Amino acid sequence: FCGSLVDRIVPGRIRDPKEVAELEQKHGYADPLLDVGEVFGVWVIEGDTKLNDILPFRKAGLEDHVFVTPDMSPYKKRKVRILNGAHTGFVLGAYLAGFDIVRDCMHDETILGYMNKMLLQEVVPILPLDQDDCKKFAAAVEDRFNNPFVNHELMSISLNSTSKWRARNMPSFLEYIEKNGKLPTCLTMSFAAYIAFYSNNIQELNDKGLVCKRAKGNEYTISDDRYVLEFYNAHKDDDIPTLVHAVMTNEQMWGQDLTKVAGFEEATVKNLTLIREQGAMAAYKSCL
């Protein structure tokens, strides 16, 4: 058995009836699990180079898409910190600001600028990987997110954002502080956006998840571990400082007490206040 890593954005079954009808007409058959993926695709297989003979992908002309390596951890770190970290870093605030799909976010100067600053100034420089390779990978993220054929919904990406921020963003956040001795502006804001998304005008907690309401007027349902949803529902009436402190000291969520990170609690109270009072777009703009 070989460990492997796939890097390709496949947003899930198409739910737009019009788009489904057009594709079924084009291809001549009905598919209840119809999906669309991006052209970009990488498959990393961890194992001995002899696998190139057993699995002859290179002979099939796929040497730019399938890689056999004795250690896939650099590829995993690059993908999780840059591609996945970008998603979790901006989508929650972007959704609160009224956006629904990733591509539209790439057409907004503020969100795009925020994402690029986060990646190029706060994430890439602290990765112990080839910097030129990471910069190229980060530069390609904008094009991948701007794919005109993939309607990647922000709510789909928001699934389990607590564990996602911990795995994708928190390592970069902590390593940046260790290296630079200060808080990373955009990654710090992304945590406040996470709290804002999970606590925005909570309506109810039901079997499907935690129901909140955004400024655009629609309700949205957060899907996450039940203990996370119950936590935010229990703290729905907290003022901002109390809520931030409760979130940061919840070691079940983060594996540590985040209030011990110098200045982080104060910065998050300030950022969450800005999001609540002026909106997520103003908060992202303040980072630029």
What are these regions (language model features)?
Residues 1-288:
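Substrate/ligand-engaging "lid" and interaction regions
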